[in-house]
Amino acid sequence: MKPVVALVGRPNVGKSTLFNRLTKSRDAIVADFAGLTRDRHYGNAKQGKHEFIVIDTGGFEPDAAGGIFKEMAKQTTQAVAEADVVIFVVDAREGISAQDHEIAKYLRRLGKPCVLAANKAEGMLAGAQLVEFFELGLGEVHAISAAHGQGIRTLVDLALAPLHLEDQDDADEQREPGIIKLAVAGRPNVGKSTLINTWLGEERLVAFDLPGTTRDAISVPFERNGQKFELVDTAGLRRRGKVFEAIEKFSVVKTLQAIESSNVVLLLIDATQGVTDQDAHIAGYILENGRAVVIAVNKWDAVDEYQRELVKRSIETRLPFLKFATMHLISATKRQGLGPLWASIAQAYKAANCKMSTPILTRLLLEAVQFQSPKRSGMFRPKLRYAHQGGMNPPVIIIHGNSLEHVTDAYKRFLEGRFRKEFDLVGTPMRIEFKSSTNPYADKATA
């Protein structure tokens, strides 16, 4: 499971700049998805072979009367408490402040790995001008410039060092094949705990032992109709003896970790409220991680026909990037519509791990070009020659040819539709990458 790094500090010290610096390598992955809402407070980052989740906790603004704890939002406090390591960002140019002392006091009491980063330190003599920050009692001060990218790699290495991480490739290899890792995601009070407890109470769910569970993560392995599942905690699962039950608890950290460690995500939407900003952010994170997804609209029994139409329309307009997902209308309390969910979950998992042969992909590509050729862009008309699979979970198709940088988004969607129909890719995102061949005569022509 990916570790979580929380960026903490008072306002305007450069946390957002550092966040953007750490996560910018991931932005290109989701740039092609129309309508995607990206929450700028959390994202994925990678350094070397180590991937991690970054959370920008926002600014701490303690007031004189209540102090820091009244001003800290509940989720912010929880995110910091649940993070694996904290990067405390201070302003090297402004120097130490009373707010910095308050935050440092809170972090010392928290007692978890913490790295102190003095931002905006470009051009400074680290030793002389940063010595005052030792007063915070958090050890060594590390000079960085988030805006210029100075000292960032060393900072991340220091932050991840106490966690003794294994390489991401090794972690992926340890996943037991044939087990569908399922996360139930959704905002607070959407009915996650009710649905999970309903599932856990079914006689058809038979628990089995699963070796090598990930660190500190509560997950429930079970079997249903011959298929093994592992339910990854997002709702606050707790163990009572040999029995698990879910409590209604929302944790950003747990949700993000569960999504990235799952194969399939069941996204719950509240029918009484429709799609909210938080729903869209969670959906965006699911897509960013390339996870298969099934949408379930809960509390369907509690709304009238007019509200039902509004909910359906809000899903179409606010989650257009998930139109590949199957949608179910359910009531967890009345156990209505729950049975078909399992078939859709299995279908999404199968689609995400679909194997596609090069001859079939190339045939489909050439048939698509013959049916509708890509538009010419100025002097150039893209020539699509052959295709092959570049990965699974999610499926990646790589198309080779010439002048492929001129392929339009509309044509890319046209190709995606053809591939999805042929391989029945329901419930999974897919990615199409274009690789243009270099012109061997280009240099000679300009010589």
Swiss-Prot record:
Binding site for GTP 1: 9-16, 56-60, 119-122
CDD domains: EngA1 (cd01894), EngA2 (cd01895)
Gene Ontology biological process: ribosome biogenesis
A Pfam family annotated for this UniProt entry: MMR_HSR1
Source species: Albidiferax ferrireducens (strain ATCC BAA-621 / DSM 15236 / T118) (Rhodoferax ferrireducens)
Function: GTPase that plays an essential role in the late steps of ribosome biogenesis.
Subunit text: Associates with the 50S ribosomal subunit.
Domain spans labelled EngA-type G: 3-167, 180-353
InterPro entries: G_ENGA, GTP-bd, GTPase_Der, KH_dom-like, KH_dom-like_a/b, P-loop_NTPase, Small_GTP-bd
Keywords attached to this entry: GTP-binding, Nucleotide-binding, Repeat, Ribosome biogenesis
GO molecular function: GTP binding; ribosome binding
Annotated protein name in UniProt: GTPase Der
Binding annotation for GTP 2: 186-193, 233-237, 298-301
Protein family per UniProt: Belongs to the TRAFAC class TrmE-Era-EngA-EngB-Septin-like GTPase superfamily. EngA (Der) GTPase family.
Domain KH-like intervals: 354-438
